[in-house]
């Protein structure tokens, strides 16, 4: 007499199934350790012998450039999350003050409406964004970038020498900038309430001695 296999309610054969043995499908620890050592050794050799061209006139290899962009964008987004944004960024006085600061400090790299590329802007890598074309950053992210700068981009940390209030003035202007014609830009720059040095002296939370110590509007920073 031949025993028939047990059949479940669904009509399929009920076969004992063993749990998946992950150890059979994953590399062993010695293999992982050896592979890590080899990759680290190759990276060390590449760095030591200077294969990678660090010159500003030699663009990054595409995978490296892609990774750096992701690192930059995520780093800025995470750190800007705690920034408290003022409610008066559309205030005309803020915008005018920011225009004066922008004209003094930023046009050499970021240009302005109707302005030709400068020698500095042409020599930068990565190239500085032309801010009159707009940016995809939030006000909080723009403030963080202006205050802390960005490594290896020639973007300085203006927070070492400028107050939070002045940097928010710059944010207010930068957000207005893409909508300005060259003539409107010149007009608004001329309307700046004071020159750069006077604006800095008048700020109550001006960093002392360039130390960057100020009443920070960033929570937890």
Protein language model regions, located:
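Periplasmic c-type cytochrome electron-transfer domains
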Residues: 15-96, 100, 120, 137, ...
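Short hydrophobic/aromatic-rich motifs at helix boundaries and adjacent loops
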Residues: 78, 113-116, 143
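Periplasmic/extracellular electron-transfer cofactor-ligation site
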Residues: 99-126, 151-157, 178-183
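Extracytoplasmic electron-transfer domains, predominantly the class I c-type cytochrome c fold
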Residues: 123-179, 221
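Short, flexible loop/turn segments with low-complexity composition
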Residues: 183-193
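Short terminal (N- or C-terminal) low-complexity/amphipathic segments
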Residues: 185, 217-221
